Swiss-Prot record:
One of its GO terms (molecular function) is pyridoxal phosphate binding. Substrate binds at residue 120. Its EC number is 4.1.1.22. Its cofactor is pyridoxal 5'-phosphate. Homotetramer. The keyword Lyase applies. InterPro entries: Group_II_Decarboxylase, Hist_deCOase_bac, PyrdxlP-dep_de-COase, PyrdxlP-dep_Trfase, PyrdxlP-dep_Trfase_major, Pyridoxal-P_BS. This is Histidine decarboxylase.
């Protein structure tokens, strides 16, 4: 590959920009504490995981053997026997959510998708793409789904086979919908467990809850039918990706034979990135579960540190249990742009992903927010 001098200069400028901002992130859930340099040599090859990793494919350059290992690992931490599960490495959380909703639609073809207003914005898009009826549910103050409103709307719609989109960590507040509560409430109105579907969006918290002492309900053992997690969030990856796991019996409904590649296919995308499979495989093989627990505990400790610092000066910051997302009043535009914060209405958040090895970046942000909010308060009262 030969670039012109101008293009070489442009790409060098971007390289330096990336170096400068490598660890910038405090407002979005992207861990940057990864090193996949041992895998760089594989970028010489076009590795394509088209089709089903458990079957033979006529496309020789695939990483199916590694994908099988990845899926066995996630079946274990999401508490489903490997032989009863199926899933794959996706292009990201949205594809995983679409896969779960697709399975649900094929199981209950004329049903409504119920999700809270704190759900990720992509779910409305998924409902349109899959041509599913959908219903937005109110949220509680902490970001959880409003269970009373959920049941009220299911009853109002006379829904016999609701499809529940459960958040295992909402985008803005890290709130976790109570899967067991949802099942209890549905049972109270006479809807049997076999008559509805629960998909769990665990984009960030899916790699937190398996490694804490007192996790909220999140797994197949707790009653879900499918779950997805992002690879570039808590795990960390230079390329966005994700993992989706579902019950094999439901996946078989959408499986088709593809003679072009001599294999079966049951994925959303056709060609799939074989390199991200290697990244996820290396990530799970290079750490023990004890090391993951220690990493998560550090992130949670940093989150509580941020809450304590805010609250010490009277700023009402908070976080949900087992969440590394710290919510606080939205500062001025100058501050949230300076620190690349995600904002929604009158709130902002910081996220203590694992590359925050000490409190320096957290302190820098908090100092600016305190100065900004306290200054605004003084101006409001006329000082």
């Amino acid at each position: 590959m030969i670039l012109s001098p101008a293009d070489q200069e442009r790409i060098e400028t971007f390289w330096n920009y990336c170096l400068k901002h490598q660890y910038f992130n405090i407002g979005y859930p992207e861990s940057a504490d990864f090193d996949y340099s041992a895998l760089f040599r594989f970028f010489k090859f076009s590795i394509n995981n088209c089709g089903d990793w458990k079957d033979y494919s006529n496309y020789a350059l695939n990483s199916f053997d590694f994908e099988k290992d990845v899926m066995a690992y996630f079946a274990e931490i999401f508490q489903i026997p490997f032989e009863e599960s199926w899933g794959y490495v996706t292009n990201g959380g949205t594809e995983g959510n679409m896969f779960g909703c697709y399975l649900a639609r094929e199981l209950f073809s004329d049903s409504t998708l119920y999700y809270s207003k704190d759900t990720h914005y992509s779910v409305g898009k998924i409902a349109k793409l899959l041509q599913m009826k959908s219903c937005v549910i109110e949220s509680l103050d902490n970001g959880e789904i409003d269970y009373d409103d959920l049941i009220h709307k299911i009853k109002t719609n006379k829904e016999s086979h609701p499809i529940i989109f459960a958040n295992i960590g909402t985008t803005m507040t890290g709130a976790i919908d109570d899967i067991e509560m949802i099942q209890e409430r549905l049972a109270q109105i006479g809807i049997m467990r076999r008559d509805y579907y629960i998909h769990a969006d665990a984009a960030l918290s899916g790699m937190i809850l398996p490694f804490v002492d007192h996790p909220q309900a999140f797994s197949f053992a707790h009653g879900i039918d499918s779950i997805c997690v992002s690879g570039h969030k808590m795990i960390g990856s230079p390329i966005p990706c994700g993992i989706v796991v579902a019950k094999r019996q439901n996946v078989e409904r959408i499986s088709v034979d593809v003679d072009y590649i001599s294999t079966r296919d049951q994925t959303i995308s056709g060609s799939r990135n074989g390199h991200t499979v290697l990244l996820m495989w290396a990530a799970i093989r290079s750490q023990t579960n004890l090391q993951r627990r220690q990493r998560i505990q550090h992130c949670l400790k940093m989150a509580q540190y941020a809450v304590d610092r805010f609250q010490a000066v009277g700023i009402p910051a908070w976080r949900n249990p087992n969440s590394i997302t710290v919510v606080f009043p939205c500062p001025s535009e100058h501050i949230w742009k300076k620190h690349y914060l995600a904002t929604s209405g009158n709130m902002a958040h910081l996220i203590t992903t694992a590359h925050h090895r000490d409190t320096r970046q957290i302190d820098s942000l908090i100092d600016d927010v305190i100065f900004d909010l306290q200054g605004a308060s003084k101006r409001t009262v006329g000082f």
